[in-house]
Regions:
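Core helices of alpha-solenoid repeat scaffolds
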Residues: 4-5, 36, 66, 97, ...
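Disulfide-bonded cysteine-rich modules in secreted/extracellular proteins
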Residues: 5-12, 73, 104, 159-165, ...
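Structural detector for internal amphipathic alpha-helices that build alpha-solenoid repeat scaffolds
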Residues: 1-2, 18-32, 41, 48-63, ...
Length: 360
């Protein structure tokens, strides 16, 4: 009886690149651990299609390939390191923790990026210290994967991430803030509030607002309301209030939505600049937030917002979150509205909450 795996392994050495590619693909389908070492050797193939097929095959084989791929992280050929680390980013386990930590110092940013991602998968607290310096890596993709890895590690990384909030380099602070948001840890709230009001860099403060929204702790509500007064932070703070979902924010959000009735908003003029754009964004975010919180007190304001172009779509989406509760006020608006365009959108919103068009 023919040994299909052995046949395909032999075909990896064929002179025809198409045959080598097909063999690698077939070995990925068969998922036999015997193919790991031959496939790793093919990572050095001159043809990219063959290398890619071998990479996919190793990924398909999975766990049996982990330790062999870990050894590839010190291969003298950088391409082999890149391909091996890319697979480990998805299948790594604790057996390759040490080679991955060493790979964080690779001169190749692709290897550093994949190594950081792989360590996030392993989630070993011992990798926090070697990961933290990569928050200031010159390559954005490396910084982002490091931030995600530290967030995945969670509690063990919190002290290092909180300490990084006072780093002299703004990029380190920025990615530390992002990581803390991803952890969704209540312990990060007070440090992030300090960043929100004290950091000298606007981008860092903006990310602090986003992170507080991700965490969703109600302690941040009153501080986010205060942050709404700062130009540039207003739309972000409104969005964060919606994500937190605390009803204390509802009156503030309704007040924001009332801004759509101002003449300079409902009938914009040329030359209003960035502030006008920010006001438009804030109005939409307020409608979205009210829909997320779903306090029925907000329904009249959202119904009224249907009449204005700048808020119509977001208000309609928000109203649908309330379900059948909004049918009566929408029908009342429909009865007194003469504008055909507005009437169309009212009917569309009614249909989305289950009101049949034939009954309108």
């Amino acid at each position: 009886m023919a040994d299909t795996v052995a046949e395909q392994i032999a075909a990896l050495k064929d002179e025809d690149w198409a045959i080598r590619e097909e063999a690698a693909t077939m070995l990925g389908t068969l998922r036999d651990p015997r193919a790991v070492v031959p496939l790793v050797f093919v990572l050095r193939d001159d043809d990219r299609a063959v290398r890619d097929a071998a990479t996919s095959a190793l990924l398909a084989i999975g766990e049996p390939a982990v330790t062999t791929l870990g050894a590839c992280l010190s291969d003298p050929v950088l391409t082999v390191q890149e391909l091996a680390s890319s697979v480990l980013a998805t299948i790594a386990d604790a057996r390759v923790r040490e080679p991955l930590v060493k790979a964080l110092a690779s001169p190749d940013w692709i290897v550093r990026m994949h190594a950081a991602k792989a360590l996030g998968r392993i989630q070993d607290p011992r990798t926090v210290a070697p990961l933290v310096p990569l928050l200031q890596d010159k390559v954005k993709a490396v910084r982002e994967e490091t931030s995600s890895a530290l967030a995945a590690i969670g509690g063990a990384a919190l002290p290092s991430l909180i300490a990084a909030l006072t780093h002299t380099e703004w990029l380190v602070r920025l990615h530390a803030v992002e990581a803390l948001g991803k952890t969704r840890s209540a312990e990060a709230v007070n440090p992030l509030l300090s960043v929100l009001f004290n950091d000298r860099d606007r981008a860092v403060r903006e990310d602090a607002v986003r992170a507080l929204g991700q965490i969703g702790d109600a302690r941040a509500v009153e501080f986010l309301v205060t942050a709404m007064k700062e130009p540039g932070l207003r739309p972000l703070a409104i969005e964060a209030l919606g994500r937190i979902g605390d009803r204390r924010a509802v009156p503030v959000l309704i007040e924001v939505l009332k801004g759509v009735e101002r003449p300079e908003v409902s009938q914009p003029i040329d030359g209003c600049g960035d502030q006008w754009d920010e006001d438009m964004i804030a109005l939409g975010e307020a409608a979205k937030a009210l829909g997320t919180i779903r306090d029925e007190v907000a329904i009249p304001s959202l119904v009224k917002a249907l009449r204005f172009t700048v808020t119509r779509a977001d208000a309609a989406d928000a109203l649908t979150r309330f379900g059948g509760t909004v049918i009566t006020p929408l029908l009342a608006l429909l009865a007194r509205e003469s504008d055909d365009n507005i009437r169309y959108h009212i009917k569309e919103t009614l249909a989305r909450v289950g009101w049949r068009a034939g009954r309108v």
